[in-house]
């Protein structure tokens, strides 16, 4: 354990698939790197993770300090100053001694054990924070990607609306449609413009949040990889409940408090001090040696209430551990259910998108041939937009579910995503 602590202290400081591919083709200025790279960078540079690392280093320093021996004490006593001389001889005596206190009854070992367990608890809390942060960062990355996808979808929808407006005007000019159709097409263009502006704003906000979470010096303008289309593998074998970072952290904190009980039980044991020194006499050049033993007497304070308080803290920590175990089990079962549901929703949304795309294609052909009214074409286009947005939402929901499952299993979400 000493080597672990010492080494730690030295640690340095769309249309279809096109929607998912277009963000990669945007400007490379301030682009978010692929998620695995961003995750590793953020774990080292994000302010929240820097704070956790500092807490672990502090706990490691405390554990190393707990191994220190008590310091010796030097005493100087000057006696008979100003006393009358006896037969012309000075009565002065100077005593110089050094006292080394010793911790008996295993007090030092108990203190060291507390330091090591507090260090282990700090490491467990850091791992818990890293796992939670990875899940949150994955969701933020996927949210930014989804917002960019919606922005591209809105831009494409605006282009379709303008094409429909041009077609409507041509039909109106040729006398095949009433001027009302042109006004309806203009209204559709205006709605598409508003939707594009809203989607652009949402994408900017999502990228800004991703930048802030990762500790980036400037806001990102795009993402360079896709989590929405990542085929993350769901572990077949259920992870042991003890692997949950929340359970490990709660258990480590319980163990640290349990070690503190031993410290409190031994606190009343006296520290014995052994003294040795020399005494010089004023009336002669001779010196004498002095030795002594000092110890406190635990007459009034035997730390009974301190022991009781430490025991109750352990009981409270055990109750928290039991609660965390139950919550961790529920969280994992819920995450597994969410992943299964998200997969079904994504499959259904993908089928719906394909059907909506085919319906729009046929409606466009029918409108241009004069067989389909404009209002029906507009309705079909809205259905296509809704279907594609639903696919984006389903992909984002799957990322959320996979991130929650990784957190429940104690894994860094999408650490090895491809």
Curated annotation (Swiss-Prot):
Residues 1-29 form the signal peptide. InterPro entries: OMF (IPR050737), OMP_efflux (IPR003423). It holds the Pfam family OEP. Induction: By nickel. Gene3D superfamilies: Outer membrane efflux proteins (OEP) (1.20.1600.10). GO terms for molecular function: efflux transmembrane transporter activity. Keywords: Cobalt, Nickel, Plasmid, Signal, Transport. The products of the genes cnrA, cnrB, and cnrC are likely to form a membrane-bound protein complex catalyzing an energy-dependent efflux of Ni(2+) and Co(2+). The mechanism of action of the CnrCBA complex may be that of a proton/cation antiporter. Belongs to the outer membrane factor (OMF) (TC 1.B.17) family. This is Nickel and cobalt resistance protein CnrC. It comes from Cupriavidus metallidurans (strain ATCC 43123 / DSM 2839 / NBRC 102507 / CH34).
């Amino acid at each position: 354990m000493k080597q672990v602590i010492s080494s730690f202290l030295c640690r340095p400081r769309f249309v279809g698939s096109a929607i998912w591919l277009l963000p990669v083709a945007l400007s490379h200025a301030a682009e978010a790197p692929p998620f695995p790279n961003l995750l590793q960078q953020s774990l080292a540079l994000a302010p929240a993770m820097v704070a956790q690392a500092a807490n672990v280093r502090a706990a490691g320093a405390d554990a190393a300090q707990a191994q220190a021996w008590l310091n010796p004490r030097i005493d100087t006593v000057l006696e008979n100053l100003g006393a009358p001389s006896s037969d012309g001889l000075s009565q002065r005596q100077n005593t110089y001694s050094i006292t080394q206190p010793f911790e008996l009854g295993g007090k030092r070992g108990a203190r060291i054990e507390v330091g090591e367990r507090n260090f282990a608890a700090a490491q467990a809390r850091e791992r818990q924070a890293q796992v939670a942060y990875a899940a949150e960062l994955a969701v933020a990355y996927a949210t930014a990607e989804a917002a960019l996808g919606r922005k591209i979808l809105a831009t494409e929808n605006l282009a379709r609306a303008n094409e429909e407006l041009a077609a409507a005007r041509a039909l109106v000019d040729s006398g095949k449609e009433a001027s009302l159709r042109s006004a309806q097409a203009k209204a559709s263009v205006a709605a598409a413009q508003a939707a594009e502006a809203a989607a652009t704003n949402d994408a900017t906000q999502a990228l800004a949040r991703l930048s802030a979470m990762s500790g980036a010096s400037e806001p990102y303008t795009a993402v360079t990889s896709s989590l929405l289309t990542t085929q993350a593998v769901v572990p077949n074998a259920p992870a042991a409940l003890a692997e949950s970072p929340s359970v490990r952290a709660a258990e480590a904190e319980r163990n640290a408090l349990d070690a503190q009980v031993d410290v409190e039980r031994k606190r009343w044991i006296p520290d014995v001090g052994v003294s040795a020194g020399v005494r010089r006499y004023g009336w002669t050049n001779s010196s004498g040696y002095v030795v002594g033993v000092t110890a406190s007497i635990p007459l009034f304070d035997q730390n009974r209430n301190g022991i009781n308080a430490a025991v109750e803290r352990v009981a409270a920590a055990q109750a928290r551990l039991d609660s965390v175990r139950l919550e961790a089990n529920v969280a994992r079962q819920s995450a597994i259910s969410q992943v299964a549901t998200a997969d079904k929703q994504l499959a259904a949304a993908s089928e719906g998108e394909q059907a909506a795309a085919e319906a729009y294609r046929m409606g466009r052909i029918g409108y241009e041939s004069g067989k389909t009214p404009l209002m029906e074409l507009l309705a079909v286009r809205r259905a296509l937009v809704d279907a594609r947005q639903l696919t984006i939402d389903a992909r984002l929901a799957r990322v959320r579910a996979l991130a929650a499952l990784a957190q429940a299993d104690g894994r860094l979400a999408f650490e090895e995503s491809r």
